[in-house]
Amino acid sequence: MHNLEQKTARIDTLCREARILPVITIDREADILPMADALAAGGLTALEITLRTAHGLTAIRRLSEERPHLRIGAGTVLDPRTFAAAEKAGASFVVTPGCTDELLRFALDSEVPLLPGVASASEIMLAYRHGYRRFKLFPAEVSGGPAALKAFSGPFPDIRFCPTGGVSLNNLADYLAVPNVMCVGGTWMLPKAVVDRGDWAQVERLSREALERFAEHRRH
């Protein structure tokens, strides 16, 4: 079993430095490099590549090899087999939409840190029993949003979250006002229409704006 405390520390460092994790779904292989470059130019250098399309693992592999300065993670990992494939492709972290006992146990034996998805106290307790203390609240908005995060801080004072799902510029301040939020995940810097037309300059602008707003709210 790899040291879970060390992997938790790596998640902490990732979230502290990243601040915002863009959640990326690759529909065209040709978009992989220019999209990542645009996000990075805007300051977003840790990317969660979802495995929702056939290009997900390819994107992780290519970016890990061709953009080694970026931190590339795998998202939408649903089972141990997919976790292993993401690790083999070069993912430096793994994010799941939910958690199962099988997946939590499997990840304990991997060098790659896992950020498990949770939406309830019961799911937190399941992962907590295995030693996990850092979570993705997903889908954040429909799971109670900032109010749920505040409520979780009572029985679970030592856990921290990366809320994802419904987080946007409009409600970013509400999430960042909650002390147990360490970073946020989102897609708002990658509007579908913008990506479809390959407007990478706009992706860069939206990424920079997102980080500026994050810094503004975390100062208060």
Curated annotation (Swiss-Prot):
EC number from the UniProt entry: 4.1.2.14
PROSITE patterns: ALDOLASE_KDPG_KHG_1, ALDOLASE_KDPG_KHG_2
Group of enzyme by EC: lyase
Keywords: Carbohydrate metabolism, Lyase, Schiff base
A GO BP entry: Entner-Doudoroff pathway through 6-phosphogluconate
InterPro entries given in the database record: Aldlse_KDPG_KHG, Aldolase_TIM, KDPG/KHG_AS_1, KDPG/KHG_AS_2
MF term (GO), any: (4S)-4-hydroxy-2-oxoglutarate aldolase activity
Xref: Pfam families: Aldolase
Record-listed pyruvate binding positions: 52, 76, 136
Biochemical pathway: Carbohydrate acid metabolism; 2-dehydro-3-deoxy-D-gluconate degradation; D-glyceraldehyde 3-phosphate and pyruvate from 2-dehydro-3-deoxy-D-gluconate: step 2/2
CDD domains membership: KDPG_aldolase (cd00452)
Active site: 48 (proton acceptor), 136 (schiff-base intermediate with substrate)
Site (Plays a major role in determining the stereoselectivity): 164
Catalytic activity: 2-dehydro-3-deoxy-6-phospho-D-gluconate = D-glyceraldehyde 3-phosphate + pyruvate
Homology family: Belongs to the KHG/KDPG aldolase family.
UniProt subunit comment: Homotrimer.
Name of the protein in its database record: 2-dehydro-3-deoxy-phosphogluconate aldolase
Organism in which the protein naturally occurs: Pseudomonas aeruginosa (strain ATCC 15692 / DSM 22644 / CIP 104116 / JCM 14847 / LMG 12228 / 1C / PRS 101 / PAO1)
Protein encoded by which gene: eda
